[in-house]
Structures are given as structure tokens and as C-alpha cells.
């Protein structure tokens, strides 16, 4: 019978022909636009984490809620939880300390300093892919163990903060003195889509360490936090793992001493789990059946838990006191000779061949075993540089304790931005260089001061383009991932930013603004730089016939060179900045994709990005003063000419060469070249989503709306790092 006959018969009997089974008829099912066009521009990344996904609503104030928290009562409850072993996931040696430390470590350890993404700041371990990574097996149990405490304290503590605090309490309850704890991590309610975890299509695909330097990746294998504990590509060779360890920890901003301290400290407590073959382990949480209720990796080996637990497949206990802090990791590492062996699951590990059975069994007090180590643990003994540090820690346990305390604090707070974002009673007083410290404000300009400064800037001889360019160069370094960069601190005037090619034109305005600062005697250069942008935008709007007030919040300060880690700030240098029509390299993605990347780092929406690009072009703010994308004969006037002329069908566009990076817009009738453009310009006419926004701003009634939207987005960027205004 034909399909039409089916429809006719079901209609005749009163049945809907589309409810008869067969195809998935649910929303979102079927072939998607990305299936048809896998290289489609990811404009959707700019719509992440909107209030529509937030069950707490846009008026929820986490800092305010946290202030109501019984902080030490929470820590007391966490301490009690550590030794309340649950039959559905029994605690090793009656303590969950090792499990909670691993949970915190693996939450924070996804951070990459190269792009500032990843890390523990949003509680992403709750969501895919991290909740189901091969390296995170059994951490679903750790998070579920925490649920009664999260339920008790509700919104006064975020999941993101709770994960890290649980790790801290686990260390403290094991006899270790931590460096401190800063809260302030706000939860999000869906997976981060912007993080590039790699392009591999299979878990645990090996990456060469050298490749990590060319991409924002933090691990040597897809699905690992750092390195393969069995050595590169399961080689079983401790020495060959050194390069991989340095690459991955280096991508987090850790030096050799911090790396050694973190590995040894993290492996002083707890154990790995490999009671039997990993083939007994079921699907991860994302793939597990609905009745598992978000848990995964159910094991059919024995009881599947406790002594029968399988996590990594490795079965390693490092120290004689796996629930109490000690220096046994280094003592065992150097005291014994190690022979390669395999775990019950078949994973490569090492055993101390000449050691007595001194390691307690986690569930049977009558049993002992020999010390065991991971392949990558032995790297700390056999790599010459790591060995020097390890022997120093062996002979000076206090130095090790201090190094681990600081490295752990850095690991767990690296993506939180400046210390001003930290809240809670245990925030350390010491300023640390990786926090990008700033001096305390000395003076806050009055309204009259601001008026006087604006007059001085207006009379300085700087053009609208120069004023806008210097302000943008200062503020646009901000990264929403780790909250680094921004205008506060005026680091545009310091190394390394003043020497970046992208800032060459912008820094030429600095002497003029520095003179104004000196003459004012009070205002910070950081405030004056941003105020220059205010004056430029207001003048450009006035030239367009609109009287616009650009909001300005004073209170920025000027950082010193000794407060600026040059190596770490080099990572903020843009590969591309489509807002300024800048691109340094052509071997990394497409120009339009890098524009989206930059906009996402600046936490912009698609309309905000569109308004800013259109405004920057007509204000003549290209990094090199080029005319690319300057679709106007009124440069310096805040008009919507960029959109009007981009969408004008009088012009056709042709690439100037085979690279298709630059284009000429020719009059269709005369063939005359009217405009030139980059891909960062033409994307607003090419991409269907961005064109829809551009059409709004190109409309005859949209000029005032465009100016207001540009100003709002501009002020947002200028204030991205003003955490003192929260």
C-alpha cells in the first residue's frame, strides 16, 4: 500500500497519520543544519548561558546569598561527610578524602592558560562532556555524595564552590594546612559550548606534546585531564612522559616546582581503582539508562564497589597513610627500586620490588601490599629537572607542604580572575602575581574632575579614531573564561602589551593621555584611557546628529610593571581581533570564526558584536588605519553607514587573491572599486543569522537604535573587569 493510502486510511478511521510510530517526531530530532553544513559559523556560541536557562532568574545575587551562609557550619558538615561511608559507594579506609580531592582537581584541571577557558569556575563537571570523560570515572559518585549538603545549604553555596571547598576540607581533615579558599564561582546551567576540547572522534586518542603548544588543549589525550598515567600512548616509559607532563601543566601556567608539588601532593592521599578488567564497566553517565538517574560506569565485576571498584583500571596506593598527610610519596619514590607490572585490569604500573608489604588494604585491615606508583609518578625521579625538585622536597617536607599549598590554591583559583572576585572568610591576604594584582585606589575623580578631563581630552588633538582605538586596545584584552585582561590597570602602557603589533597605533596616543594624567595630578591613566573613548564616541554621535551620554564609572587604578607577569600576559595577545580588522596568522581557523571567538571572550551577544563592529568601522578604528570595512565617506561619524552600504546590492564583492581574506566591492554598473573589506566585514552580509541583525541596523528607522546599542555594548566592554562595581 502506498504512503498516500496509509494517510487516507488512518484519516478515515479518525487516527492522526503522524502518530503511528516509525520516525522520531520529537523537537530537535532529525537532520540538523550542522549536519548539512558542518562548517557553519558558530554564532550560537554567543547565546550561551542566557537567563532563559537559569532557574534562579536574572535577579539572583550569588554574592548576597553567600553572605548568608554558615560557612564554618558547612565545613563541619563536609568534614563529617568524609567519614560517613555509604554502602552504595563505600569509602576507601573509611574516608572519601582522596575521592573529593580528585573531584576538585579534575574540576579545576581543565583550565588552559592559552585561552582562559575550562577550569572549575562554572561547575562544568556536572555536564557533558566532563561528567562522562574517561578520566572522570566515579566522580559522579563524589558529586552525588555531596548532594545532601548542597540540598541543605541550597543557593547559599554554588556547586562550583562546593566542589573546590570539598577538596580543601578533604586535605585539611587529612592533616594538611591549605593556603586558603576564595568563593565566588557562580554556577551555569548548561554545558560550555565554546571550549575546544580537540577534534579527535575517539576517547583517549594520543596527542604529541609538541602539538599542545599549537592549540588550546590541556591534555595529551582526548578525555584526560592531563597525561596518560601509563606514559605517552601507554608506553610504560617514565622518562618519555616528562615532555607531556611539562606541556600539559605548562598550559595551565604551572612551572616545574608547582608541577612536582601537585603530582606528589595529589598522590599522597587515596588510591586508584582497578580491581578487574575495565570491560566490566558500563556506560558513562550521559549514555547510561534513565533508571541510573545520572550515575554511570556501573560495574558487573563482583559487587562493583568497594574492593571490587574499577575506575581507571590502575590499582595504585602510594603511601602508608592514605588518609593522612605525609611525605611518604617522596620517601617511597626514592627509597625503593621499581619494576614494571600490571594491575588486575591489565594497566601498566610500577611496584616497589624491594619493599615490604607496608601499604594497608582499603577494606581488609588484615591485608597489606607493596607500594605502587604510576608510570608518571616515576617521571619525578628519572627526569633530571624533576628529580632535583623531588629530592629537595624529600629532604625538606616543609618546603613541599608550602609548595603544594600554594600550587593547589593556584590550581583551584586560576580561572577566577583578580582577588577582588573572591569572597568568604578564608581568602588569603597575600597578593599573588598570577592574580594580576592591582594597587589600592588612591583617588576617585569627582564629577567636576571628569568634566575637566573630558575637556582636556577633547582639546588634546587626538582624533575620534585615536580616542576610540586606545580605549578599545586597553579594554578588549578581557577574557570571560578566566576574567583576565581589561582596562583596569592600564597595562596597555606596560610590557608586553605596549609592544604588540595590534596596539602599534593605539599606543601612539598614550603620551598625550599620560601628559593629561600628569597635569591632572590625581586621575589614573586607566580611567583617562577609557574616558578618551567616551569623548570619542560622544563626539562621533554628536556629528551624526545625536546627543548621547556615554556612561563612565571612574575608579580604575594603574598597575606597576612588577605586578605584571609578562609571560602570562603574552597569552592575551590576540591572534586576531575582528573588531579592529586585525589578523596575525592565517593558519588558525577562519577570520570570521576568530571574530566569534573574540566576541565570546568579551561575553558579547550577536547583536552586541554586530553593533560594535559596525561602529568601529565608521569610526575608523582599524588597527592599521586601513580602509577595509570602512563603508562610509564620513569617518568619525557614528552612523549606520557600514550596514547600509554592506547590504546595498549596487555593489558586488570579489576576492583580491586566492587567500580570499581581502575583497573589493565594485559598482555593478561602472566596475569602479568603491570599498575594500575583510572576511570580518563581509560575514555580516554572508551569514544568515548575522545578516538578520545587520538588516535591523541598516533600516531607515534604525540609526538612533544603532547608536544606543553601540554605546551600551561599548560601555559593557569598558567595564568587563570592573568587579568592584558588582
UniProtKB/Swiss-Prot annotation:
There is a cross-link at residues 105-226 (Tryptophyl-tyrosyl-methioninium (Trp-Tyr) (with M-252)). InterPro entries: Catalase_peroxidase (IPR000763), Haem_peroxidase (IPR002016), Haem_peroxidase_sf (IPR010255), Peroxidases_AS (IPR019794), Peroxidases_heam-ligand_BS (IPR019793). Its cofactor is heme b. Heme b binds at residue 267. Keywords: Heme, Hydrogen peroxide, Iron, Metal-binding, Oxidoreductase, Peroxidase. Residues 1-33 are annotated as: Disordered. Its EC number is 1.11.1.21. PROSITE patterns: PEROXIDASE_1 (PS00435), PEROXIDASE_2 (PS00436), PEROXIDASE_4 (PS50873). Formation of the three residue Trp-Tyr-Met cross-link is important for the catalase, but not the peroxidase activity of the enzyme. It comes from the Bacteria. There is a cross-link at residues 226-252 (Tryptophyl-tyrosyl-methioninium (Tyr-Met) (with W-105)). Gene3D superfamilies: 1.10.520.10, Peroxidase, domain 2. The keyword Metal-binding applies. It is an enzyme of class 1 (oxidoreductase). Binds 1 heme b (iron(II)-protoporphyrin IX) group per dimer. The active site is at residue 106. The record marks 102 as: Transition state stabilizer. GO terms for cellular component: cytosol. GO terms for biological process: cellular response to hydrogen peroxide; hydrogen peroxide catabolic process. One of its GO terms (molecular function) is catalase activity. PANTHER family: CATALASE-PEROXIDASE, HYDROPEROXIDASE I, BIFUNCTIONAL CATALASE-PEROXIDASE. Belongs to the peroxidase family. Peroxidase/catalase subfamily. HAMAP family: Catal_peroxid. Bifunctional enzyme with both catalase and broad-spectrum peroxidase activity. Homodimer or homotetramer. This is Catalase-peroxidase. It comes from Shigella sonnei (strain Ss046). The lineage of its organism: Bacteria, Pseudomonadati, Pseudomonadota, Gammaproteobacteria, Enterobacterales.
Amino acid at each position: 500500500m502506498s504512503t498516500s493510502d496509509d494517510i487516507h486510511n488512518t484519516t478515515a478511521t479518525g487516527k492522526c497519520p503522524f502518530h503511528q510510530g516509525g520516525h522520531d517526531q520529537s523537537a530537535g530530532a532529525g537532520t540538523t543544519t550542522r549536519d548539512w553544513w558542518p562548517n557553519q559559523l558558530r554564532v550560537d556560541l554567543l547565546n550561551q548561558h542566557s537567563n532563559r536557562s537559569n532557574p534562579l532568574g536574572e535577579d539572583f545575587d550569588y554574592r548576597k546569598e553567600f553572605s548568608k551562609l554558615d560557612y564554618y557550619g558547612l565545613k563541619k558538615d563536609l568534614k563529617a561527610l568524609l567519614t560517613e561511608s555509604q554502602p552504595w559507594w563505600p569509602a576507601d579506609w573509611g574516608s572519601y578524602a582522596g575521592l573529593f580531592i580528585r573531584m576538585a582537581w579534575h574540576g579545576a584541571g581543565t583550565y588552559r592558560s592559552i585561552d582562559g577557558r575550562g577550569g572549575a569556575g562554572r561547575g562544568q563537571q556536572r555536564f557533558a562532556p566532563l561528567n562522562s570523560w574517561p578520566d572522570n570515572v566515579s566522580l559522579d559518585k563524589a558529586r552525588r555524595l555531596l548532594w545532601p549538603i548542597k540540598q541543605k545549604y541550597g543557593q547559599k553555596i554554588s556547586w562550583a564552590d562546593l566542589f573546590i571547598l570539598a577538596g580543601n576540607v578533604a586535605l585539611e581533615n587529612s592533616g594538611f594546612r591549605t593556603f586558603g579558599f576564595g568563593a565566588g564561582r557562580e554556577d551555569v546551567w548548561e554545558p560550555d559550548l565554546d571550549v575546544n576540547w580537540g577534534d579527535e572522534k575517539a576517547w583517549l586518542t594520543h596527542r604529541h606534546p609538541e602539538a599542545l603548544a599549537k592549540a588550546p588543549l590541556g591534555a595529551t589525550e582526548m578525555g584526560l585531564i592531563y597525561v596518560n598515567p601509563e606514559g605517552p600512548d601507554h608506553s610504560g616509559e617514565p622518562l618519555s612522559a616528562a615532555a607531556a607532563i611539562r606541556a600539559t601543566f605548562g598550559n595551565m601556567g604551572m612551572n616545574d616546582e608547582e608541577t612536582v608539588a601537585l603530582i606528589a601532593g595529589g598522590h599522597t592521599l587515596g588510591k586508584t581503582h582497578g580491581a578487574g578488567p575495565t570491560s566490566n564497566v558500563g556506560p558513562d553517565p550521559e549514555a547510561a539508562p534513565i533508571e541510573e538517574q545520572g550515575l554511570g560506569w556501573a560495574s558487573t565485576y563482583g559487587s562493583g564497589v568497594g574492593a571490587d571498584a574499577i575506575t581507571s583500571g590502575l590499582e595504585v596506593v602510594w603511601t602508608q597513610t592514605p588518609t593522612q598527610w605525609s611525605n611518604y610519596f617522596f620517601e617511597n619514590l626514592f627509597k625503593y627500586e621499581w619494576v614494571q607490572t600490571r594491575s588486575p585490569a591489565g594497566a601498566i604500573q610500577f611496584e616497589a620490588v624491594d619493599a615490604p608489604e607496608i601499604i594497608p588494604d582499603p577494606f581488609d585491615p588484615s591485608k597489606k601490599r607493596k607500594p605502587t606508583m604510576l608510570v608518571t609518578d616515576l617521571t619525578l625521579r628519572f627526569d633530571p629537572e624533576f628529580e632535583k625538585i623531588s629530592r629537595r622536597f624529600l629532604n625538606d617536607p616543609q618546603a613541599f607542604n608550602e609548595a603544594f599549598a600554594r600550587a593547589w590554591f593556584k590550581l583551584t583559583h586560576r580561572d577566577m580572575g583578580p582577588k577582588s572576585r573572591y569572597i568568604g572568610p578564608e581568602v588569603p591576604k597575600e597578593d599573588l602575581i598570577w592574580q594580576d594584582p592591582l594597587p589600592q585606589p588612591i583617588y576617585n575623580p569627582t564629577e567636576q574632575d571628569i568634566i575637566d578631563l573630558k575637556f582636556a581630552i577633547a582639546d588634546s588633538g587626538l582624533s575620534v579614531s585615536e580616542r576610540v582605538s586606545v580605549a578599545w586596545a586597553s579594554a578588549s584584552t578581557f577574557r570571560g573564561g578566566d576574567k583576565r585582561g581589561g582596562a583596569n590597570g592600564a597595562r596597555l602602557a606596560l610590557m608586553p602589551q605596549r609592544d604588540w603589533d595590534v596596539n602599534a597605533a593605539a599606543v601612539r596616543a598614550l603620551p598625550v593621555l599620560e601628559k593629561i594624567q600628569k597635569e591632572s595630578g590625581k586621575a589614573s591613566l586607566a580611567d583617562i584611557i577609557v574616558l578618551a573613548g567616551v569623548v570619542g564616541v560622544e563626539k562621533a554621535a554628536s556629528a551624526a546628529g545625536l546627543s548621547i551620554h556615554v556612561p563612565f564609572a571612574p575608579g580604575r587604578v594603574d598597575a606597576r610593571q612588577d605586578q605584571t607577569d609578562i609571560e602570562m600576559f603574552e597569552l592575551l595577545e590576540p591572534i586576531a581581533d575582528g573588531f579592529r580588522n586585525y589578523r596575525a596568522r592565517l593558519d588558525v581557523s577562519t577570520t570570521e570564526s576568530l571574530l566569534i571567538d573574540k566576541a565570546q571572550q568579551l561575553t558579547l551577544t550577536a547583536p552586541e558584536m554586530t553593533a560594535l563592529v559596525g561602529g568601529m568601522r565608521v569610526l575608523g578604528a582599524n588597527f592599521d588605519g586601513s580602509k577595509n570595512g570602512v563603508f562610509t565617506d564620513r569617518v568619525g561619524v557614528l552612523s549606520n553607514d557600514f550596514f547600509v552600504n554592506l547590504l546595498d546590492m549596487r555593489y558586488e564583492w570579489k576576492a583580491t587573491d586566492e587567500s580570499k581574506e581581502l575583497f573589493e566591492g565594485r559598482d555593478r554598473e561602472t566596475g569602479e572599486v568603491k570599498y575594500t573589506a575583510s572576511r570580518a566585514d563581509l560575514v555580516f552580509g554572508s551569514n544568515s543569522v548575522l545578516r538578520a541583525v545587520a538588516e535591523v541596523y541598516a533600516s531607515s528607522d534604525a540609526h538612533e537604535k544603532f547608536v544606543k546599542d553601540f554605546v551600551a555594548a561599548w560601555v559593557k566592554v569598558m567595564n568587563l573587569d570592573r568587579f568592584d562595581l558588582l
